[in-house]
Amino acid sequence: MPQTPSVCVIGAGLSGLVATKALLDRAITPDVFEIGSAIGGNWRYDNDNGRSAAYASLHIDTSKDRFALADHPIPKSWPTYLHHSQVLAYL
């Protein structure tokens, strides 16, 4: 039987969370490292990691239908272009 690889994911922003989910879907449990105290990366306004470029009125520039993950839909009641706080809640 093949040995399960040891994997780490750097960052728990959108890309890091998607990578983590893909690994978990393949029965690989990664170690996830995030410099901030919570997930969200660039979508976390006032992120305590000091690296987020989010600003108070930030919205995504693509529709929620294009942004959503295939097996994790965005609520239909949410607007087409999400505010950063909604993106963070979605994550």
Give residue spans per PLM region.
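Short, solvent-exposed coil/turn segments
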Residues: 2-3, 62
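N-terminal Rossmann-like FAD-binding beta1-loop-alpha1 element of flavoenzymes
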Residues: 3-32
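Glycine-rich active-site loop/strand segments that organize a redox cofactor
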Residues: 35-38, 42-90
